[in-house]
Design a protein with these regions (language model features):
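Condensing-enzyme catalytic core mediating Claisen C-C bond formation in acyl metabolism
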Residues: 1-27, 222-289, 293, 300, ...
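Conserved beta-ketoacyl condensing-enzyme motif
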Residues: 22-113, 118-135, 190-213, 285-286, ...
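Short, well-ordered amphipathic alpha-helical segments that serve as non-catalytic structural scaffolds
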Residues: 27-43, 68-72, 97, 148-155, ...
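Conserved catalytic cysteine-centered active-site region
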Residues: 57-110, 131, 142-153, 221-247, ...
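Active-site-proximal alpha-helical scaffold in enzymes
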Residues: 88-118, 156-186, 254-261, 326, ...
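Conserved N-terminal phosphate-binding loop of PLP-dependent enzymes in the Aspartate aminotransferase
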Residues: 119, 125-131, 147-154, 192, ...
Length: 391
């Protein structure tokens, strides 16, 4: 098998869905910005050498339909000869796209692929515009369609995760994210997005241009008292609230994935080396625990132990789910999400895995660590985990 490297890995800042800066920015535009940004970070690479674009998207319809990867690649200015594919493994779609690119390169099917993900939760609702469940499953296994919030309630109930513990976890996520932003830790991975707005101005709306650079999810005004005051969002007697759940978000991310030999020939210094990727199925009604079963598989493929991993980016779908994974998988909490997670920074579904890849690579370099892991729970009852090596 050939060695595969990550030559660049970038993301847009993440906007709050519905009321945030990216609410009117199309997901294909966001993806194009991320693709262009990733390619521009590798000036030695002629775009004509890119053989494919793979983009993940959890709800690939409407503005993010029509094979959004192809639309975005053309919008990014890549040559028409560069083919493109959109893939979907729900929340791990962005990580899956990077793994698919790497595996294809490992087996000699390509030398250079751009991979990532995009999602506008402002434009495409959770579940898409028309949810049409399978009648047999509705009758025989209705939990296959259990809402994500209720799956988190199941995890919290079975594992005894208390409301205060979940809210404390959420508060720490905001505090770590704010510290990371103030310390400029995300600056290198973020590609700014220029956004036009129309603001009220009497009979003639005023056009305003802004350059969006900073994730807008983290809240400096939150507190444990404020979080504890929120009502349960999914079950009247539950513990899962809007405050201890991931934010609905808009964003995109992309990476240039290459064979090590081609990178060396072009004089490209790698950011990281791709090591392994694994998925696992689990009960849909406790889908948030999927990483517990994917992580050991990814470690085994890599020939590593959990103690070898220096940084872990665990997608914070819900605080209860995150605490459940940390407990059941035996993760070192000090290594998990050192710069905050999706509860503070947002979760643009199909983008997030690629976004977290950009983050884990930079954190490895700051810590002079060797191995980093990105791991995600997946709606429908799955987990995914990918391992990268600092170079």
């Amino acid at each position: 098998m050939r060695e595969v490297i990550i030559a660049s890995s970038v993301r847009t800042p993440v906007g709050r869905a519905f009321k945030g800066t990216l609410r009117a920015t199309r997901p294909d535009e966001m993806a194009a910005i991320a693709i262009k940004g990733a390619v521009e970070r590798v000036p030695q690479l002629d775009p004509k050498e890119i053989e494919d674009v793979i983009m993940g998207c959890a709800m690939p319809e409407a503005e993010q339909g029509m094979n959004v990867a192809r639309i975005a690649s053309l919008r990014a200015g890549l040559p028409v000869e560069v083919s493109a594919l959109t893939i979907n493994r729900f929340c791990s779609s962005g990580l899956q796209s990077i793994a698919m690119a790497a595996e294809r390169i490992m087996t000699g099917g390509a030398d250079v692929i751009v991979a990532g993900g995009t999602e506008s939760m402002s434009m495409i609702p959770m579940g898409g515009h028309k949810i049409s469940p399978n009648p047999w499953l509705v009758d025989h296994y209705p939990d296959a369609y259990l809402s994500m919030g209720l799956t988190a309630e199941r995890v919290a109930q079975r594992l005894g995760i208390k409301r205060e513990a979940a809210d404390e976890f959420s508060l720490r996520s905001h505090q770590k994210a704010l510290a990371a932003i103030q310390g400029g830790k995300f600056d290198d991975e973020v590609v700014p997005v220029s956004v036009s707005f129309s603001t009220p101005n009497g009979s003639k709306p005023k056009r305003q241009e802004v350059v969006f650079k900073v994730d807008e999810g983290p809240r400096a005004d939150t507190s444990l008292e404020a979080l504890l005051a929120l009502k349960p969002a999914f079950h009247a007697k539950g513990t899962v609230t809007a405050g201890n759940s991931s934010q609905m978000s808009d964003g995109a991310a992309a990476a240039v994935v290459m064979s090590a030999e081609r990178a060396q020939a072009l004089g490209i210094k790698p950011l990281a080396r791709y090591i392994s990727f694994a998925t696992a199925g689990y009960k849909p009604e406790e889908m948030g625990l999927g990483p517990v079963f994917a992580i050991p598989k990814a470690l085994k493929m890599a020939g590593l132990k959990l103690s070898d991993i220096d940084v872990i980016e665990l997608n914070e779908a819900f605080a209860a789910q995150s605490l459940g994974v940390i407990k059941e998988a035996g993760l070192d909490a000090e290594k998990v999400n050192p710069n905050g997670g999706a509860i503070a920074l947002g979760h643009p579904l199909g983008c997030t895995g690629a976004k977290l890849t950009a983050t884990v690579i930079r954190e490895l370099k700051r810590r002079n660590g060797r191995y980093g892991m990105v791991t995600m729970c997946v709606g429908g009852g799955m987990g995914a985990a990918g391992i990268f090596e600092n170079v």
